[in-house]
Amino acid sequence: MGRLVFNYRKAMREPKKIQQLTENYSLPFAVELIPAINYFIFVGLCFGFWYGVRMIFPHAFDNSYVIVIFGIPFFLTMLVTKIKPEGKNIYIYFFDFAKYYFFIKLPQKKYCNDRKIDLSNEKQIEFRKLVKVVDYSNETKNAYEGNTQEFAVNKNGRRVGVLPNKKQFDSYAK
């Protein structure tokens, strides 16, 4: 008997649907939840816009309530359902875009290899002068000897190999 591999991706990505409204009443067909929520949000927005226009111009759009309540929200719901920028839901896309804009673009943060660069906004970056490092105590003399690593600080807390009485080492010297 061979091994059966099941792919549940299609079943898990099935949108949530509403059919049973109350215990005694159910719809004859299922309605997807997200487009239904979008529709009622767009009905509220269109009705508010229509009401504002009617307050300013009382005789404008006398018999257009059918278009405002059913037509425009239905069109906007279908449009929002079809548009998938970068393969994402449009609301998730706008949320991610707002997060990027307010947390990265406006503060002018810069990243390199997913790490924040702290000194990218500095006008002038100063480097410390180089010093000549000398430590011949555990020098490897033969190829068969091991190269044991030492700490950069000795027991007294001083840096090993830096000669403070010597002058600065110039890396650009010829």
Curated annotation (Swiss-Prot):
Membrane-spanning ranges: 29-51, 66-83
Gene Ontology cellular-component terms listed: plasma membrane
Membrane topology qualifier: Multi-pass membrane protein
InterPro entries reported for this sequence: TcpE
Localization terms from the record: Cell membrane
Keywords for the protein's UniProt record, in alphabetical order: Cell membrane, Membrane, Transmembrane, Transmembrane helix
Domain of life: Bacteria
Record has Membrane as a keyword: yes
Main location: membrane
Name under which the protein is recorded: Uncharacterized protein YddD
Lineage summary: Bacteria, Bacillati, Bacillota, Bacilli, Bacillales
